[in-house]
């Protein structure tokens, strides 16, 4: 019977899971799936490592299964269907670890209490990340759980990259640039040495482009600057998040439009970005397929902001050796990659159009001074590795 670890990534009305089993000392996915629409029309589906459906259930329209009920179903499924593996722990993606957590940590009640302090900094993610942790602590208190943080990878940034120009009394309360998508960037940094040695050792910008988007500047695989700051609403425009915003806009919304904090939070996190600009969709695929000029405006703004941030991060690096595209848009949209690389020509990026169209791993032209890569991210595998290491050190 081999050891296994479950990785959970919980959202507001869904969660994704992956079951990793140890084979020859390496974690291999043996099952993965998701539970969705937990409060309206719950559905659970699981597939084996080859993609074959091995479990499926629907509860019907109007059912309210909730996270607790879905977790109960998942635990039962794992016991029934993957009994050949011994579950040794659970790894969780937790968006915000603040200043306290610079590496993955074994969870107990005190850790949960500490992490709840960061709910206001990541309202779309943090409370939902913590929900399954608390549920499993109550149901299976002896099962080790490990929290892995999207902020930890960036804690090694130089102080100047983390600071806002605010009074020390505010900074000391934890108002800093934290950066996010760290598990994705950490995974990319971990695989670069075997795929792109120059990118691994040099000055590299990784573009995590998806429904949530950010960019990270690395030197020798270590984060030195990133586009997201105090919250995951900063930086690039995203599916529904506005990205970089003049603080004066928030004051105007309060003083002149009479909006309160909750209304502004909803605007910034749920009604802006690609959805807000286009008025059509938060999904880049929908916008790319549309001939509506508002869709074009949203795409143009997205590309423009990426180009601006490329210049900023290249300045922080003092030059540029490689760029890496990852996440849903970065891995799958040859059109967006072409536009970004075109805008980055002044930095020395030259694209191989055919390689880009084929979604090759290396998409830079032979004449390009800056390497260009497409590397799929794997945050779940990163969490599984961390969870195993923490559990082994107990």
Language-model segment annotations:
Residues 153-254:
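Glycine-rich phosphate-binding loop of actin/hexokinase-like ATP-binding domains
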Residues 218-219, 224-260, 266, 328-358:
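Catalytic phosphate/nucleotide-handling subdomain of diverse soluble enzymes
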Residues 74-125, 144-146, 153-163:
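Short beta-strand-loop/turn "lid" adjacent to the catalytic site in phosphate-handling enzymes
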Residues 5-7, 14-63, 229:
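Short glycine-rich, Thr/Ser-proximal phosphate-binding strand/loop in the N-terminal lobe
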Residues 266, 273-277, 284-316:
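Adenine-nucleotide phosphate-binding core of ATP-dependent small-molecule kinases
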Residues 76-88, 192-198, 310-321:
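Phosphate/pyrophosphate-binding loops at sites that engage ATP/ADP/AMP, CoA/4′-phosphopantetheine
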Residues 296, 300-320, 330-394:
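Internal helix-turn-beta structural module
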Residues 10-11, 93-96, 209, 320, ...:
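Glycine-rich beta-strand-to-loop/alpha-helix junction loops that act as flexible
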């Amino acid at each position: 019977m081999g050891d296994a670890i479950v990785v959970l990534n919980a959202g507001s009305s869904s969660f994704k899971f992956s079951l990793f089993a140890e084979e020859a000392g390496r974690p291999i996915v043996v099952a993965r799936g998701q539970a969705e629409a937990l409060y309206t029309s719950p559905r659970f589906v699981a597939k084996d490592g080859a993609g074959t459906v091995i479990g499926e259930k629907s509860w019907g329209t109007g059912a309210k299964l909730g996270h607790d009920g879905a977790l109960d179903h998942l635990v039962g499924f794992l016991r029934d269907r993957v009994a050949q593996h011994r579950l040794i722990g659970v790894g969780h993606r937790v968006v915000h670890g603040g200043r306290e957590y610079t590496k993955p940590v074994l969870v107990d009640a005190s850790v949960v209490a500490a992490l709840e302090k960061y709910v206001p900094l990541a309202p779309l993610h943090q409370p939902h990340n913590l929900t399954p942790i608390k549920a499993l602590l109550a149901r299976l208190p002896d099962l080790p759980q490990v929290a892995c943080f999207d902020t930890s990878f960036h804690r090694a940034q130089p102080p100047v990259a983390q600071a806002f120009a605010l009074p020390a009394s505010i900074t000391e309360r934890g108002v800093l640039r934290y950066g996010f998508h760290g598990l994705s960037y950490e995974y990319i940094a971990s695989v670069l040495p075997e795929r792109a040695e120059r990118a691994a050792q040099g000055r590299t910008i990784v573009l995590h482009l998806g429904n949530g988007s950010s960019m990270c500047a690395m030197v020798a695989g270590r984060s030195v600057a990133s586009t997201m700051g105090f919250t995951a609403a900063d930086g690039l425009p995203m599916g529904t998040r506005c990205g970089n915003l003049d603080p004066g806009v928030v004051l105007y919304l309060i003083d002149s439009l009479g909006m309160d904090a909750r209304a502004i939070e909803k605007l910034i996190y749920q009604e802006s970005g690609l959805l807000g600009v286009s008025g059509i969709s938060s999904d880049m695929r929908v916008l790319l397929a549309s001939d509506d000029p508002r869709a074009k405006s949203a795409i143009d703004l997205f590309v423009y902001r990426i180009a601006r941030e490329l210049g900023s991060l290249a300045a922080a690096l003092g030059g540029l050796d490689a760029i890496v595209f990852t996440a849903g848009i970065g891995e799958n949209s040859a059109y967006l990659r072409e536009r970004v690389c075109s805008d980055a020509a002044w930095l020395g990026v030259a694209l191989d159009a055919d390689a880009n169209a084929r979604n090759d791993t290396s998409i830079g032209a032979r004449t390009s001074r800056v390497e260009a890569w497409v590397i799929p991210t794997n945050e779940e595998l990163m969490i599984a590795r961390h969870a195993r290491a923490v559990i082994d050190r107990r």
